[in-house]
Amino acid sequence: MTSLRRGNICWVAVCAALLTLTRGIDVIAKPSRTPSNGDVQLVGGASPAEGRVEVFYNGAWGTVCDDGWEMQDAQIVCKQLGFASANSTRCCASFGQGTGVIILDDLACTGDETRIGDCPHRGWEQHNCAHTEDAGVVCNGKVRLAGSPNPLQGRLEIFHEGEWGTVCDSDWDLKDASVVCRQLGYPSANSSSNVSFGPASTAQILLDRVSCMGDEHGVEYCEHGDWKNVSADCTHSRDAGVICTRPIRLVGGNGPMQGRVEILHNGEWGSVCDKGWSFQNAVVVCNQLGATQPRRPQGVPVGGGVGPTHMSFVNCDGTEATLEQCSNSGWGNAGECGHSNDAGVICTPAVRLVGGNTHIEGRVEVFNNGQWGSICPESWDAKDAEVACRQLGNYPLAEGDCCPQFPADVGVVLDNVVCTGNESRIQDCAHQDWGVVDCSGGQAAGAKCQATVQLVGGSHPLEGNVIVLRNGRWGSICDDNWDINDARVVCRQLGNYEAVAATCCAKYGQVPQEIILDDVACQGEEGRIEDCYHATWGSHNCGGSESAGVVCREIRLALDDSSSNLPKGRVEIVYNGVWGRICGTDWDLNDANVLCRQLYNSTAESVHSFKNGSGPILLSNFKCTGSESNIFDCTHNPWGDYTCDDADAAVVCRGGLRLAGGRTPLEGRVEVFHDGQWGTVCDDGWDLLDAKVVCTQLGNYEALSAKCCANFGQGTGPILIDGLACNGNEDLIEDCRHEGWGSHNCQHYEDAGVVCTDLRLTHENGSVSTNTLTGRVEVLSSSGEWGAICGKYWDKKDAEVVCQQLFNTSAMDTRKFYLSSPDQLINMGEVQCNGSESLLLQCPRASKPFTAQTCPGGETAGVLCKDIRLVSGNQREFGAVELLVDSQWGSICADNWGPNEGAVACKQLGYCAAKGTQKGLQPARTQGKMHFSSMNCTGSESRLRDCVHTYGGYTCNGLVFEAVVQCKAGCDWPGPIRHGSFSPNRSSYDPLTTIDVKCDAGYELMGSKTLQCVTGCDWSRPTPECQRISNCSIGGGGKPSVGAQAGPAGGVMLIIGIILGAVVMMLIACVALYLKGRNKNIGRGNPATTSAIWKPKKEFDELKEPVLSFSAMTAGGAGPEDGMGEDI
């Protein structure tokens, strides 16, 4: 090793040693000179201004006993160290136990001494103490913040040589401010500010050109200019200021105002035990964080912390400024409280947006000293608005017009707000003192935030699958554990709407966005869905058909009589997140009928008068015809017309009806409203006549089927009706005969359900198609008439929606039907579905009416829906056969399953033919729904339903219970072909594929040059052959003729030519090898030898061309993929 290397290693060792020595040193406040007897230092504190008191005596540091330890003693220690004064005393080894000698005991300072050794005491090293009694002190540091009532921010003042002064802001930045904040006991700085705090200082400017690295223990240890020697341009208008972060935070929640409570102590964050945790404790935490009242004092899902537990048994009365001022167990005395008992809170943000079109845009109002006030718009920009949106609930700032101005309808309380954009709250930004404003024009600052939740796929804006915004991308929510409490939060987040239903199973179509939220568990009181407990973002075990959805409502009845048999009450509506009333002027039975139909699928018993509510009057003068489906479709005065001299609008509805748990709005469990509550209907005697009345009441729909046995899930309320016996002509379900309200002998597993429809399929002759999944599509009009759909623009996406709505299956193809008569009714035209809608009526469509005469081409729309599938197979063409019956998939018993049945199944599935059939899958699967116990086909049928069959699978037994088929999707490989190949060369080919056939050199094709895979998975022609060319004509320029007789001379000449060519090639090779060997030997000075000419095989291998090629004599036909064939 060179001396330079040794030198480098030595330097590395020295640097490493120095780095090790400088790490982990306690924060110690002590003189920089060599200590002498009576010097003091503070050890073990989080800053130089606090710690265990240690005194130097007889060459060693020792501690002070806390017997008689008081503020006068602490004042002398702090002044001796250069601090302005003492803040508090600490006993009982609060900063840890020392290890040296106990130097002093029974101190009794008067306050006039300059050094601790001058105070009366028991005597040096005289004591009756242990290190558990070591005294400590907290000094008022050498820095303070002035000019602001907020202890976290202000003008920086520094203590030097007995006086306080300011610091010039030259070179002042966030690193300098962070050092000051840590020196004051705060975690770090939010910003370094030069905003004026309070009246201008009159103190001397002590420092300028401060330049901290960021890790110093105090600002005085940073690089800076000479004390009291500052630049001439440093005036008090340039006094440096800071805004510090709080020594308390919320961690582990889903927003800045919720989570596990953590506090900073001795430079370390730690949690608080929830033993004795109360609402008053949460109030103090929220006040300390600058928020308003807590939403929920306990039970917040916050996860476990990882640091120490600083405090336990906290007991606040709600008036304390900080949590540590409340009575508690003492720092670090948490007992056996683990992190499973960490306390948490959810605080209400001290900001709100008022006067906008939604709850997330409007005038910014902040809460301070018990009242709300607005902000002056001067200097207000996107960074300020960004902080407001974050504080409101982690909303991103809307793109475009982020910062509109609004009328200052409440007093302006804040001016000159300057945010960096990183703050959590507006109150943490630099600003003028509260109430000190210079703002004119009557305007206030505003913000427009971007919504983080949307509904997609619904027929109106207040229903659909839920998607949420996370880190700039939208994603869906899995429906695991999804319930009405989750829906309440989503509807509130969308605009304080009322939740009607929580939906599952991608009810409004599959969402293209990936699932990013799962296992949501809201209490129902949260402000945002993100605030609810949920699995880790992006973690889920769901598929695309499990998207969660909601149905919200912007209108409701404030029921004034819960004992009433009928739904009745004051009508309330929501606008911009605020619920209000409708003026009763001109409110009549037509208006009431529309409302009752909209809310309860019923009619109005009467209009009614109730005592007025407390919300604003939002609408008035409704003039409905009675045929509208939504109260807002009626004419009325503009929003915000508050003139009303009448009572509030109110109604009494005749009962109520709704469907729950269905895949579409037209199917589900039947629920009725009676005696102030919703309940179910028992399926005893439930039939299609009962279903017909339900579907008619819901909107003149046609009943497709009556469902029993809680087909749409079990209800949870009372069972209100049993033994229903409708004749089919009633208008309302309560008009039918039944056992009496609430009288039943049923359980919820007997809840009745229905499937209604506004679609049907008909045959070409107009008859209704009841047992097939193909036919002309007809739509039910609002007047109750069935009509066709013009087929001009009908495509596969439209057909997909129809098949999903009617049968919960996909579309195999579209169909077109000619008009059955010139007078045939057409109800719809130019449908433009995207394929994800759950109802055809949700698709965009032309508003212009169509008739048989105006429908282009005279064709109507039809569909062919898929009613067969293969499941549980390991490949696409193989599996157990399942058929769709009554919207349910079920299998076929394999007892009579054979080649004929397999051929029909494959034909129906769209395959060419069946390769084979078998009974049961391996491994066997659990037996599910079985539709057919036998199936007997001739093989000529187009569908399995056309075969002779028996419904039900009760007689099918054993592990091989289900029919399985292997279908052919195309033609097999047509080879092998000897001495030839196919292009393309594959193991199988799709129908209508054409392949080329080629022969090797010396062979000629006998047959067609192409083959095509035709219907039935057969090739269009037999596979051709390649035959050897037996003779060639020489010199004639003609094509070799297979089988032609050449003369003897021609044959002899051919053989002689081949032999002579071979001899010439060998001679050339020998000469080349000779010359190569000779040159090598000459280069070495050795004579050429025979062995140098005749080298081993390797040198022949190095030749660029082969001597002779026999490939044409040995090539065979190529097989699929490998290109190899057989040798002769």
UniProtKB/Swiss-Prot annotation:
Any one GO CC term of the record:
cytoplasmic vesicle membrane
- In this UniProt entry, which residues form the Cytoplasmic topological domain(s)? 1073-1128
Q: How does it sit in the membrane?
A: Single-pass type I membrane protein
Instruction: Identify the residues that the record assigns to the Sushi domain, covering every copy.
Output: 969-1028
- Which GO annotations describe the biological process of this protein? innate immune response; phagocytosis
Q: In which tissues is it expressed?
A: From the mid-gastrula stage, expressed only in mesenchyme cells that are migrating toward the body wall. At the brachiolaria stage, expressed in presumptive coelomocytes of the coelomic pouch. Also expressed in adult coelomocytes (at protein level).
Any keyword Disulfide bond? yes
* Domain SRCR, chain residue ranges per copy: 40-140, 143-245, 248-348, 351-450, 453-553, 555-654, 657-757, 759-866, 868-968
The highest taxon in the source lineage is Eukaryota
Q: Which residues are glycosylated?
A: 87, 190, 194, 229, 422, 601, 612, 765, 808, 834, 936, 985, 1031
First-listed, main subcellular location of the protein, grouped into a coarse class: membrane
Q: Would you indicate the residue range of the signal peptide?
A: 1-24
Can you list the disulfide-bonded cysteine pairs? 65-129, 78-139, 109-119, 168-234, 181-244, 212-222, 273-337, 286-347, 316-326, 376-439, 389-449, 419-429, 478-542, 491-552, 522-532, 583-644, 596-653, 624-634, 682-746, 695-756, 726-736, 803-865, 833-843, 906-967, 937-947, 971-1013, 999-1026
Pfam families per the UniProt record, alphabetical: SRCR, Sushi
What does the record give as the function of this protein? Involved in aggregate formation and phagocytosis by larval mesenchyme cells and adult coelomocytes. Binds to bacteria and may act as an opsonin in the innate immune system.
**Protein name per UniProt:** Scavenger receptor cysteine-rich domain superfamily protein
- Taxonomic source organism: Patiria pectinifera (Starfish)
Name of the gene encoding the protein in the UniProt record: SRCR1
